[in-house]
Amino acid sequence: MAAVVSTAGIIYYLMNEVDFAKSKQRELENQSMSLSEDVASLKKLKVGLQSELLDREEKMQTVSDRLSDLEKVLGVDDSDDATLESRLDTAAITSSVRLVLLNQIPNGSPVEKSRMSSDYGRRINPVTGKSEFHRGQDFSAPKDTAIYAPADGVVEVVRPSLVKGSGNYLRLRHSFGFSSSYSHMNKFAVKMGEFVNKGDIIGYVGNSGLSTGPHLHYEIRFVGRSLDPKPFVNWGINNFDTIFTKVGGVRWESLINNVEQRVSAQLQLSSLKAAPLMASSE
């Protein structure tokens, strides 16, 4: 009899434990659902804040572009390009400095085997039919043609959008105040915050946003101001000097001096590291 009572007690105890475990499980599931809802809400808030930030950046860029246009109308030129050639001795720029510049500043075409379909400057917008300033270079190419990074950089913006103006949009932040952006893409090959090297595939040509056909809208900016991309697209080691006279608004002399100092410091550091090795081998 005592054994039966003992067994019944154990069963009762185990049943209570099961009920308690089930209750705990339901509680944890409810907490998990609540946390999932919180995470989803935070993600939605993050997307909203990112979108708002990008909208404000675009408005700031528009204001900057309008100021630049006004300066051109008024004849204001703070780049002092007229005396640049006399101050900048391009022949004295070493091969090391040239390689640094060509790795860090956008150059070459971001799309191979493409056709330049619309240049930088005032034009009639093919979608709206209105006259407006086109702040980039368009490249016509088949859908899913690879887009390459024109210089080392970090992915600053990745914004998916199939219907809004720029469509699927990506922006790279390069060195020395330069940035490049890519609109109407079909898909991305990189994520925000990712570092890329010159020549890496960053995405593919598409027809997203306000677009009349598959193409890439390519922009280059310096400290937020748009520049004509064509001189950069045509720039390379064989015509290295041309960029300094074709692109205004950049203090090239100051930039090159900065790079020369960096390269010199790196060479000195390399020499110091090599000195003990040479001494030990003698």
Where in the sequence are the language-model features?
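Active-site/binding-pocket entry motifs
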Residues: 121-125, 155, 161, 226
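Conserved, short, structured surface segments that act as functional micro-motifs
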Residues: 116, 166-174, 194-258
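Zn2+-dependent peptidoglycan hydrolase active-site motif and core
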Residues: 132, 149-192, 214-215
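Extracytoplasmic
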Residues: 83-85, 111-113, 132-136, 142, ...
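Generic structural motif
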Residues: 109-118, 145-155, 196-199
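Conserved positions in beta-strands of structured domains
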Residues: 117, 154-156, 186, 203-206
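Short glycine/threonine/proline-enriched tight-turn/helix- or strand-capping micro-motif at secondary-structure
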Residues: 93-100, 117-149
